[in-house]
Amino acid sequence: MRQHTLEQAYAYCETVCRNASTTFYSSFSALQPDKRRAVHAVYALCRWVDDIVDGDEEPTILETLELRQATDERQRIVDDIHAGTSPSLTPDEHRRRMMALVDIRLKLHQASEQSISQSDHPIFIALQDVFQRYPIKLNDFETVIEGMEDDLYPVANQTWDELRSYCYKVASAVGLILIE
């Protein structure tokens, strides 16, 4: 496995941000360098999970027994939330994307606990540093991932409260992360 320094990890996140959204990238340039790097890391994670859910990213997953069990457990929770609704994808594709989100969730926990290694994905290396420097809540990242899980199902918000809940997950939670 490739080893990444913290500087390389932040450079990777900056590249993701610059390539994905020149508007966001330009607006972030007004921030102080340390805050800008942290925002690039958060943006890179959000872009990555969105690309996975949309099928624009093929995640490399080391499928372990722990990951399979965690995915099964998370799928039961998501099935309860979306009771009566089938995923938008084939069962195999849905499982693959759900497993990728669970893997990311587990890695976020490791980053918040400062247990990421230099061989982990550069986004997690950068986020580990962000968790150390800023009072960011892991729960807000989990809320963003819950919004991505919702995107694996047909979005059919029928009430204002349903729309508000969805928007909170995919937008407001990101804002809560960034204001820290």
Where are these regions (language model features)?
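Acidic catalytic motifs of isoprenoid enzymes
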Residues: M1-E180
